[in-house]
């Protein structure tokens, strides 16, 4: 029962302050420019935060340059970017809030079970935004849209950690 109460609160929280249609469009437009750069996005995260790389047994202790061009790296990068793409596709439509909550809850649960901390999620966020701001069409409105959307998503994640 407690789970359903927390889930309901997360959905209400996301709905209470959803991104606007213009913000959703800005998020989608900027994401469209980088969503096929899966390997580069994950490499940027690992380069910025080696502690995150260390959380992946198949990549821990290895030089980033030696793993970046491997199939295992590309596959995992595709999973991460694919998740973000799913969320980006759903953002901006309040009727999608339950679907977003389900995806985010699954991510939260699996990462909680692996001992991933709020700090590491925030590190990931920082690297993602840094990558976006330097590789996508970016302005103040786009930055505000991503901040708003990520605040909603990370609020939901942190409610489950």
Curated annotation (Swiss-Prot):
Pfam families: Globin
InterPro entries in UniProt: Erythrocruorin, Globin, Globin-like_sf, Globin/Proto, Mb-like_M
Keyword terms of this UniProt record: Heme, Iron, Metal-binding, Oxygen transport, Signal, Transport
GO terms, molecular function: heme binding; metal ion binding; oxygen binding; oxygen carrier activity
Annotated heme b binding sites: 76, 111
Domain Globin residue range list: 18-161
Signal peptide residue numbers: 1-16
Cellular component, GO annotation: extracellular region; hemoglobin complex
PROSITE patterns: GLOBIN
Domain of life: Eukaryota
Note: There are at least 12 different components in Midge globin.
Homology family: Belongs to the globin family.
Subunit: Homodimer.
Protein name (Swiss-Prot/TrEMBL): Globin CTT-IX
Gene: CTT-9
